[in-house]
């Protein structure tokens, strides 16, 4: 445990270092033309932007928690920061000989990061646009569209082809080697890996000889991704040793393929699929292979999911999880109430002593559809969420509660560290510390119980980090729109795009803010660049240039990381926290 914690802290420290270098690079791009000399005042301003932005991210709630947690997200954050900085290094040296070595290194790190977390792949669109902006002088809609398609193709190639299907093809080789040739398990996989790497190596050699630069870079990058991805071999080696903890036992290629394909988590619809109340019309089956006692692969067919009637398949199904309670979905969607007569179990209207019918408020939720299941009985009444209710759930729960709430935790303030089980005003909301704003949606903030008022997770930043980041965002948009779009790609892909992809259900077992750390990392770039805007404001107000303005701007903006550190210290300090206490 101590080594894991130490590694996470060290990885987090390097993440902050690479963030500092990234912010200073982007600040230099704003202050000077490429290749121009920096003045002393500019150097101080650049260092100030890096210090403020990097320290702000250091003390944000989400990153600080991940840095001291024995999980993969600290190392994942380091890989994210590293590949972005390396791509900016390439952009700086793109005209020099052998500058493509930076892209080759990025490809290797991408492959290596797959063994940590696939979240790092979401940096690909930003990296592609860095390449596009560096290689073209005139930005066009066609160029932007092509770059977007290329980045999507790279994501699909790595996530849907390299990660699962290289192992699957190797598993098919292993099936032939074991069942037909009588060779040991994994021998076919080893043969396939050697053959694949050899073929790619030959391709790299011949494309280099013939001067096919682009194809050579593609093949070399693919080779580097696979070499980095080979770190997953340790999973199979460890599983083959049969340790006490051996989840899914990926000791052969087919078991490893199932693990990489995330079969243990089941399927969830993304853009098209059923709602939680959709009836089933049958089972989905798939063939799986396992090793029998004779060391041969056997094939069995297992149930992998449910099939649903076509009329119950819809676009953008956000309320999809049949295991989640219907009431949980209702509380987060646009359900309404209407007045109706109270009825008993026989459907008769209930009346009072004077014979007047009782009226009650009932939920008005969903769309009612009659479905004949072919059993010969009366059609079933299926209550489906409407598209409007789906969108309301998406904006209210998935976007607001599961992303923007976390965003505001980090840059506005946090009410408590108690996870809310519903949309209640006493637990887990954002809190600014500005009384009249907080009372607009949380009610009176006076005379609060001790468990709320003295909760260590109650941190208030008075909107200061948020405002400085917003200033930096607008400043970069006006002064350097190309690099602004790159940071925005990071912010959106590591944030809102993940919200759409994860399609979360109500009542998650834990808070999921750590997933969006990359998005908060991007916003801290804007916090750092906000120092330049404050510096320009001081120069405009005093009519004086020189060292005074950048020094004053840095000192003033240091309030942001200062308040983050001061407010978050008590709930993130791990001193004397042991298993026995």
Task: Give the residues covered by each predicted segment.
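Membrane-interface transmembrane helices that cradle and orient dolichyl/undecaprenyl
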Residues: 27, 40-44, 83-102, 129-139
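Signature aromatic-anchored transmembrane alpha helix within multi-pass, membrane-resident enzymes
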Residues: 153, 222-226, 477, 481, ...
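Short hydrophobic alpha-helices at membrane interfaces in multi-pass membrane enzymes
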Residues: 44-51, 93-111, 140-153
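Aromatic- and kink-enriched transmembrane "portal" helix at the membrane-lumen/periplasm boundary
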Residues: 2-5, 30-43, 53-77, 110-118, ...
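Loop-to-helix entry region of an early transmembrane alpha helix in multi-pass inner-membrane enzymes
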Residues: 2-17, 21, 35, 39, ...
């Amino acid at each position: 445990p101590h080594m894991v914690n130490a590694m996470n802290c060290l990885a987090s420290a390097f993440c902050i270092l690479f963030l500092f270098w990234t912010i200073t690079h982007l600040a230099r791009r704003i202050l000077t033309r490429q290749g121009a000399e920096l003045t002393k005042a500019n150097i101080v301003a650049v260092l100030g932007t890096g210090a403020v932005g990097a320290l702000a991210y250091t003390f944000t709630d989400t990153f600080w928690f991940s840095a001291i947690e024995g999980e993969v997200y600290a190392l994942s954050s380091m890989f994210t920061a590293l590949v972005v900085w390396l791509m900016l290094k390439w952009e700086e040296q793109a005209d020099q000989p052998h500058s493509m070595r930076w892209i080759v290194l990025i490809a290797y790190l991408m492959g290596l990061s797959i063994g940590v977390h696939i979240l790092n792949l979401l940096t690909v669109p930003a990296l592609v646009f860095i390449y596009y902006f560096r290689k073209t002088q005139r930005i066009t809609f066609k160029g932007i569209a092509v770059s977007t398609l290329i980045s999507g193709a790279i994501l699909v190639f790595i996530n849907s082809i390299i990660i699962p299907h290289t192992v699957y093809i190797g598993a098919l080789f292993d099936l032939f080697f074991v069942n037909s040739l009588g060779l040991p398990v994994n021998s076919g996989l080893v043969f396939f890996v050697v053959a694949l790497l050899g073929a790619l190596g030959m391709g790299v050699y011949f494309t280099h000889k013939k001067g096919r630069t682009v194809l050579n870079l593609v093949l070399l990058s693919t080779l580097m991704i696979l070499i980095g991805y080979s770190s997953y071999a340790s999973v199979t080696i460890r599983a083959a040793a049969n340790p006490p903890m051996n989840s899914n036992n990926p000791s052969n290629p087919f078991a490893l393929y199932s693990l990489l394909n995330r079969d243990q988590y089941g399927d969830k619809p993304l853009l098209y699929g059923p709602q939680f109340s959709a009836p089933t019309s049958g089972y989905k089956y798939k063939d799986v292979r396992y090793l029998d006692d004779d060391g041969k692969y056997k094939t069995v067919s297992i149930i992998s999911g449910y099939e649903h009637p076509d009329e119950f398949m819809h676009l953008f199904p956000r309320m999809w999880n049949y295991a989640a309670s219907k009431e949980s979905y209702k509380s987060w969607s646009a359900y309404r109430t209407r007045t109706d007569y109270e009825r008993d179990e026989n459907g008769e209207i209930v009346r009072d002593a004077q014979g007047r019918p009782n009226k009650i408020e009932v939920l008005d939720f969903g769309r009612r559809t009659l479905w004949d299941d072919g059993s010969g009985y009366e059609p079933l009444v299926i209550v489906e969420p409407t598209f409007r209710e789906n969108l309301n759930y998406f904006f209210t729960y998935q976007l607001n509660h599961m992303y923007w709430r976390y965003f505001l935790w980090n840059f506005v303030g946090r009410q408590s560290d108690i996870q809310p089980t519903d949309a209640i005003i006493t637990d887990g909301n954002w809190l600014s510390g500005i009384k009249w704003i907080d009372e607009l949606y949380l009610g009176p903030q006076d005379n609060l119980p001790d468990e709320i008022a003295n909760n260590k997770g109650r941190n208030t930043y008075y909107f200061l980090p948020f405002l400085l980041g917003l200033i930096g965002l607008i400043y970069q948009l006006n002064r350097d729109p190309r690099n602004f779009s790159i940071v925005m790609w990071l912010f959106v892909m590591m944030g809102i795009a993940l919200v759409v992809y994860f399609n979360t259900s109500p009542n998650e077992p834990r808070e999921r803010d750590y997933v969006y750390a990359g998005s908060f990392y991007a916003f801290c770039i804007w916090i750092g660049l906000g120092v330049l805007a404050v510096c320009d404001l001081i120069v405009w107000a005093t009519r004086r240039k020189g060292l005074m303005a950048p020094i004053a701007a840095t000192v003033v903006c240091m309030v942001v990381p200062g308040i983050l550190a001061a407010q978050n210290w008590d709930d993130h300090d791990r001193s004397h926290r042991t298993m026995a206490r």
